[in-house]
């Protein structure tokens, strides 16, 4: 029977979304072949071996929660009692973090369907708007001003997905958005498998998002690198801002 690297096998079996993620699971001691822990990412394992991931290396419904939790801790922001919009909610990692930190209500918005974790669907504090583009939100979707907007969207630039949600923000409202260079950069700057490796491109797209937010009436507080990478090892950034008075 043919063999291949443990990290690649985890990806092929759908147990990790990228080799970078697979390597993190192996380092955390969460990946097994049979009952034996996988020791190294490069370990050769039979392609038909019984492999599994046991436990999690974070407490959230998805690893996306690691990103927002890091940002809020770094910023020292208390969001207890906040009404929030989660743009690109997906499984609900960001929503999970906000509820854990005391958010009063979260409007979970995603163009997909049946992605939000069941425990969040059952939470009275979560208002689910599936199959709903953030670009077409109305007062029927968001019937109150919001204190916080978070965003982890894919396949679209922030300047295209955020303007409508931002219109629901109170003066002084806060924003934490994930900058994904592969969706902000020029097409020729995006390499194989959608990866942007050029640090100069990273810096430029972060600057462009910052400038756009400030032109839109928001004061940028800080931009920090995400504590974990995206698919295929893409470096991502978290930008934080507050809404200025009109």
Where are these regions (language model features)?
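Core SAM-dependent methyltransferase catalytic element
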Residues: 228-246
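S-adenosyl-L-methionine
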Residues: 107-156, 160
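Short, glycine-/aromatic-enriched active-site segment of Class I SAM-dependent methyltransferases
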Residues: 181-198
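A short glycine-rich, Lys/Arg-flanked "PGG" loop and its adjoining helix->strand segment in the class I
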Residues: 159-176
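Conserved SAM-binding loop of SAM-dependent methyltransferases across substrates and taxa
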Residues: 91-102
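Glycine-rich helix-loop-beta junction characteristic of Rossmann-like nucleotide cofactor-binding loops
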Residues: 15, 73-80, 142-143
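A basic, amphipathic helix-loop patch mediating RNA/tRNA/ribosome contacts
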Residues: 1-49, 83
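Conserved class I S-adenosyl-L-methionine
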Residues: 80-90
